[in-house]
Amino acid sequence: MPRSLKKGPYVASHLLEKIEKQKNLKNKKVIQTWSRSSMITPVFVGHKIAVYNGREHIPIYITENMVGHKLGEFFSTRTYRGHNKKDKKGQKK
């Protein structure tokens, strides 16, 4: 079920505070966060945010197309190592 409209989007309060501090700076630093469930709002546009995927922080530049999505949607948390190759012994020629 989606979140109620009267509640508004979920954004971690510490993340909003960090963005407000950097809003007027010329040299914007990368903001690190562990909050993958925070929704991207128009305030985030133009900032670079490093989201934790379980192993490392991966930076992403926020654009207008990303507004309304969650931060965790843009990174996978699992590594794909490919399918196992079968032995040549059992294959037909």
Swiss-Prot record:
GO cellular component, as recorded: cytoplasm; small ribosomal subunit
Keyword terms, alphabetized: Ribonucleoprotein, Ribosomal protein, RNA-binding, rRNA-binding
Lineage: superkingdom: Bacteria
Coiled coil location: none
A Pfam match: Ribosomal_S19
Keyword Ribonucleoprotein set for record: yes
GO molecular function: rRNA binding; structural constituent of ribosome
GO biological process, one term: translation
InterPro entries registered for this protein in UniProt: Ribosomal_uS19 (IPR002222), Ribosomal_uS19_bac-type (IPR005732), Ribosomal_uS19_CS (IPR020934), Ribosomal_uS19_SF (IPR023575)
Family label: Belongs to the universal ribosomal protein uS19 family.
Matching NCBIfam families: rpsS_bact
Function: Protein S19 forms a complex with S13 that binds strongly to the 16S ribosomal RNA.
The name this protein goes by in its record: Small ribosomal subunit protein uS19
Species of provenance: Phytoplasma australiense
Lineage: Bacteria, Bacillati, Mycoplasmatota, Mollicutes, Acholeplasmatales
